[in-house]
Amino acid sequence: YRQRQGCRDMELRDCYAEFGGDYKEVLGRLEREQTVQKFVLKFLDDKSFSSLETALQNRNYEEALRFVHTLEGICRNLSFTRLYESSSRMTEAFKAGDFENAAAGMPQLSDDYHQIIRAVEAYKTCREG
């Protein structure tokens, strides 16, 4: 993001545009930009993704379902549209007992997740200074 625009110009809506989220929707849900910002920044510390990776590596599909479902809920609440969609597909596959198809969704989910992390970290860096 920094290459395309000046860091000081980066707003939370720009961050959402960067990773394919719905800023207008989340602002309608949470009502204040400060509230949205608080929860978006807290997402950087959420362990659902790393726990999901570990559960998949250990072939613990019950735990994987729990973590991907948690991630799906967070993404729905924060209007992280792309990551919500990929986590929702994985959740449904796990619930259907289709573990192979669920695990096959991990590369897309990982890409979507890391795109959010990069954008939010850039936003955080810009805000700090």
Across the structure, where does each feature detected by a protein language model lie?
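Two-component system phosphorelay core
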Residues: Y1-R66, T70-G129
